[in-house]
Amino acid sequence: NVALAAGAGVRLGSTGAIAVDERMETSVPGVFAAGDCAEALHLVTGRPAYVPLGTTANRMGRVAGACAAGGRDRFRGIAGTSILRVGRLAFAVTGLLAAEARREGFDPASVRIDAMDHVKYFKGRPTSVALVADRRTHRLLGGWVTGEAGVPGRINLIAAALTTRMTVEDFEQLDLAYTPPFSPARDPVQVAANELLKLLD
């Protein structure tokens, strides 16, 4: 609810939420906003976005509190990373899917792969990974992961790649940990990146 803020002269952004700078300060000097009432910079599009998540609110609140107390913290933005569980399956997403990327002016290429989260002799379970990248720059734009195990780590890896503006080539070459009880020799996210590269070359 932003009615109180709007009534007090605080500027609302293009998303309808409260517009803030990287210090979480509103258009009214000395007044800060954070959480579900405030918009944030989207790290992929570079534009304001409204993605009300607990993790985002927590990070925003820490920056707003520090800056209100005279600190110099900065909120760098969001990728919209989220996860949920339905039964035994976890579903996670970060960044832009292909249709969203197209609407934002990118020329997206996307791929989905189905793999095992462990080698078979360690009772590997099915997992699926999708990645989206821009055809011109090869920059990763987003992705999603589903499966029974390992989903949080894989989606967080993709989110980190978005935050650092990695290309698919960079992502595919990451030096990730491997031992049979924990993962396959080629992690499913890198298998997906390798398949995506075939669409970009």
Mark where each language-model region is:
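FAD-site-proximal beta/loop scaffold in flavoenzymes
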Residues: 1-63, 157, 161
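Active-site-proximal substrate-binding core of FAD-dependent oxidoreductases
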Residues: 47-51, 67-94, 174-178
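Residue-level structural signal for beta-strand termini and adjacent loop
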Residues: 32, 69, 145-146
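Short, amphipathic alpha-helical "lid/cap" segments that border enzyme active or binding sites
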Residues: 57-65, 69, 189, 193
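A short alpha-helix-loop-beta-strand transition element characteristic
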Residues: 11-15, 71-82, 107-111
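N-terminal glycine-rich dinucleotide-binding loop that anchors FAD/FMN and/or NAD(P) in oxidoreductases
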Residues: 96-98
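Flexible, glycine-rich terminal cap/loop adjacent to redox cofactors
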Residues: 88-91, 102-201
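Solvent-exposed alpha-helices and their adjacent loops that cap or buttress functional pockets
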Residues: 24-26, 76, 123-124, 133
